[in-house]
């Protein structure tokens, strides 16, 4: 389930289109279908402008969310309430209400690459912390690109393994996510 895509069209009939709140409005519909679990496509904060371009006069942004900027934060553009310090509140409420209706929540989590891209990409986090530890690099310092997205996290490193475990644990304990 794509948070924005599920309710962004007027035909969804929701007030809060393209948001966590919009999905909450659709819980009766999900129950009517007999749904007992939803898998949300990436919901972490991502760089929507990372692949910004124009196509036939239309502005296109990164839609899917696979170029994560912060693995510990829900995407703020998926929230209808943009008041400061309310970040994450709508997602927590959505998960709680889905659980109340017997629907489990699974997240599509992609750790194999980030929004930092290759050596030409921006510095958001890992590059600035310890590029040689967090990313797999060729002997000449370029990024391995097994994913086709410009970089690959170096899961051979204990600190990267710990980061992944900490991240998954955070989503389970803080947001009550059921699986990945």
Describe the residue ranges of each PLM region:
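Active-site beta-loop-alpha junctions of metal-dependent nucleic acid enzymes
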Residues: 22
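Substrate-binding/active-site clefts of carbohydrate-active enzymes
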Residues: 4-18, 28-179
């Amino acid at each position: 389930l794509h948070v924005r895509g599920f309710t962004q069209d007027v035909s969804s009939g929701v007030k809060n289109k393209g948001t966590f709140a919009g999905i909450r409005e659709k819980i009766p519909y999900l129950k009517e279908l007999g749904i007992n679990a939803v898998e949300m496509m990436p919901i972490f904060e991502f760089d929507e402008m990372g692949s910004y371009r124009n196509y036939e006069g239309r502005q296109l942004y990164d839609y899917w969310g696979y170029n994560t900027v912060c693995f510990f934060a829900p995407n703020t553009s998926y929230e209808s309430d943009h008041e400061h310090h309310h970040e994450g509140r709508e997602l927590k409420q959505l998960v709680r209400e889905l659980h109340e209706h017997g629907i489990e929540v699974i997240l599509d989590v992609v750790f194999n690459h980030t929004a930092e891209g290759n050596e030409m990409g921006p510095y958001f986090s890992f590059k600035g912390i310890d590029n040689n530890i967090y990313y797999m690099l060729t002997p000449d310092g370029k990024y391995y690109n097994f994913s086709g997205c410009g970089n690959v996290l170096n899961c051979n490193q204990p600190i990267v393994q710990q980061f992944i475990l900490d991240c998954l644990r955070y989503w389970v304990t803080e947001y009550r996510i059921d699986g990945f």
